[in-house]
Amino acid sequence: MDKNILAIIFVAVGTYLIRYIPIHLHSKIKNIDEKVKEINEILIYSSTSVISALFITSFIKFPIIFSNVLISTISLIFAIVSYKKWNNLGISILISVVIYYLASKFLISI
């Protein structure tokens, strides 16, 4: 399997689990309102920090190759524009993943 596709799958699964696990655990455990408030204070920024870490590690690779930075920038621009248009994070992520894949296939083959 292509390394890019494998990396995209891992990031997608990681992103899904970051959102699914807290909802799943909350529905399974009863009478946790006090604990949720305490945990929420700690975990409120966890998904943002994990996504940021995934983004930074995928955006900056050494040695820095211009085509990789260009592909990531193009994908990021499409993610921002699509989010501004539809206000839907899922659609913007899907569009940016598709654009990243297409741009990596097109720009690397040049």
Curated annotation (Swiss-Prot):
Q: Where in the cell is it found?
A: Cell membrane
List the InterPro entries. Brnchd-chn_aa_trnsp_AzlD
From the record, give the transmembrane residue ranges. Answer: 5-25, 62-82, 90-110
Query: How does this chain sit within the bilayer?
Result: Multi-pass membrane protein
Keywords from the named record: Cell membrane, Membrane, Transmembrane, Transmembrane helix
This protein's GO cellular component annotations are: plasma membrane
Give the matching Pfam families.
AzlD
Q: Is the Transmembrane keyword given for this protein?
A: yes
* Origin superkingdom: Archaea
Family, according to the entry, reads as follows: To A.fulgidus AF1754.
| UniProt protein name | Uncharacterized protein MJ1155.1
Taxonomy-wise, where does this protein's organism fall, top ranks first? Archaea, Methanobacteriati, Methanobacteriota, Methanomada group, Methanococci
